[in-house]
UniProtKB/Swiss-Prot annotation:
Domain of life per record: Bacteria
GO biological process, one term: pyruvate decarboxylation to acetyl-CoA
Protein name: Pyruvate dehydrogenase E1 component subunit beta
Subunit and interaction comment: Heterodimer of an alpha and a beta chain.
Cofactor dependency: thiamine diphosphate
Alphabetic keyword roster: Oxidoreductase, Pyruvate, Thiamine pyrophosphate
Family annotation (Gene3D superfamilies): 3.40.50.920, 3.40.50.970
The reaction(s) this protein catalyses: N(6)-[(R)-lipoyl]-L-lysyl-[protein] + pyruvate + H(+) = N(6)-[(R)-S(8)-acetyldihydrolipoyl]-L-lysyl-[protein] + CO2
Broadest EC class assigned to this enzyme: oxidoreductase
Length: 326
């Protein structure tokens, strides 16, 4: 059976809304229009306007309302039309949702999911293309999820909705329409569990979200050069499955990290720091990080392509670590 990422997300929300009447969806265009990307399609008809709530164009307003509802015991799913617009709600996410459980000594929970497309799409320019993975991963109190496949989107969304504290669920606009094979029943997937998509012996490639597609293509190309790559899909950025990464590096002795976001203070830099500390003696070459260029993402199609990680960038990085000599 195949379903799209869009259908996987909708099915997860539908199942949890049927299972728990405290779950509701709120955001711009989520009800009558059925979501800017049709992720909430059919939910208004099934659950009504008290549980699928259209809002004015004020992320600060509806995010704050949803955080308050979570403090009161409800389970909001907040859809941002893009995580770029979530900057308007940053105070509620960081200072209220993320911190209150700790500041209350564990007395107040905040079971809320903030979800929507993150990062580049196709020529939507700098103010609609920023990747916020590293930004949210930096904040204590937030769990950060960035899946690739339809099965992982659904399984991790089920887990996110059931979590008693805030989850940042980072989707990708381009992936919404992609179809994947899925089992008949998709169970909740625990956080902090990465997945080895391909076992290998020469080099470990670590990535997440839509960059998994890039890495899969490159792994197949490099097979022709007799470079045997092990590919890890992180799925959850925070908490991070450090054990899987370290065990893989101990086997392959080389590491390349791929992310769409910027290099400085990025996800790749954090992973590299952990591996240098925990598995330094196993490395036969310096760690390579393939990332987006240090510029606001351009609108022009040729410049947008140059600013993003490419297959050639990844191939070059893998060959660099595999052919490294002192």
């Amino acid at each position: 059976m195949q379903i799209t990422v869009r259908e996987a997300l909708r099915d997860a929300m539908q199942e949890e809304m049927l299972r728990d009447d405290k779950v509701f969806v709120i955001g711009e265009e989520v009800a009558e229009y059925q979501g800017a990307y049709k992720v909430t399609q059919g939910l208004l008809e099934q659950f009504g306007s008290k549980r699928v709530i259209d809002t004015p164009i004020t992320e600060y307003g509806f995010a704050g309302l949803a955080v308050g509802a979570a403090f009161a015991g409800l389970r909001p799913i907040v859809e941002f039309m893009t995580f770029n617009f979530a900057m308007q709600a940053f105070d509620h996410i960081v200072n209220s949702a993320a911190k209150t459980h700790y500041m209350s000594g564990g007395q107040v929970k905040c079971p809320i999911v903030f979800r929507g497309p993150n990062g580049a799409a196709s020529r939507v320019a700098a103010q609609h293309s920023q990747n916020y993975t590293a930004c949210y991963s930096h904040i204590p109190g937030l769990k950060v999820v960035a899946p690739y496949s339809a099965e992982d989107h659904k399984g991790l969304m089920l887990t996110a909705i059931r979590d008693d504290n805030p989850v940042i669920f980072l989707e990708n606009e381009i992936l919404y329409g992609h179809s994947f094979d899925v089992p008949d029943i998709i169970e909740p997937i625990p956080f902090s569990k990465a997945k080895i998509l391909k076992e290998g012996s020469n080099v470990t490639i670590v990535t997440f979200s839509i960059q998994v597609k890039l890495a899969l293509d490159v792994v197949n190309i490099l097979q022709n050069d007799n470079i045997d790559c092990e590919l890890i899909d992180l799925r959850t950025i925070k908490p991070l499955d450090t054990n899987m990464i370290i065990e893989s590096v101990k086997k392959t002795n080389r590491l390349v990290i791929v992310e769409e976001g910027w290099f400085f203070a990025g996800v790749g830099a954090s992973i590299a720091s952990i591996v240098m500390k925990e598995a330094f003696d196993y490395l036969d070459a310096p760690i390579e990080i393939v990332s987006g260029k240090d510029v606001p993402l351009p609108y022009a199609v040729n410049l947008e392509k140059l600013a993003m990680p490419s297959a050639n960038d990844l191939i070059e990085a893998v060959k660099k670590v595999c052919y490294y000599t002192i």
